[in-house]
Amino acid sequence: MVRITLSRFAYLLILKPAMAEFCQQYPGIQLEISVYDGTVNIIKERFDLGIRFGDILEGGVVARPLMKPFREGLYASSAYLSRHGTPEVPADLCHHQLIGYRFITNNRILPLLLNDRGEQLTVEMPGQLISNDIDVMADGIRNGLGIGRLFEPVWQLQPDRERFIPVMERYWKK
């Protein structure tokens, strides 16, 4: 048995595309998959493999990159932009709704960080919708509830991604 812990995002981008082929190719290996967006002590919980995004590691853990770096984008629906206009610069965002993300690990809301010619900007925006789930955030964007953040690979997984209009691409964080 191979015990794997990974975030939902890591499951969607890394494991899901390869799982069926792996199981067919190695029928004698049983996989136990734990999908959890919180912090997991891989050693204490006796996992064989953990997949997370970021660069914070527990002691005694070895990390290897599995993906190339990607950008976090801002997206809105055409209906939202028709009602509220398209922001052009960070100062415009104070007149828009942010679909926020709350960390499951510490209950903090992820600040909106943008990049302006190498300078990091923290932008305060009002928001009606906050979630700890990328599908809820994508649904909020899709339904015109505000401007939301999605990592580019998550945007690429959306079956109707043409409905997600990129906003202020020159300020996206890499």
What are the residue ranges of the model-derived segments?
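Central regulatory/effector-binding core of bacterial HTH transcription factors
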Residues: 1-62
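C-terminal regulatory
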Residues: 44, 58-174
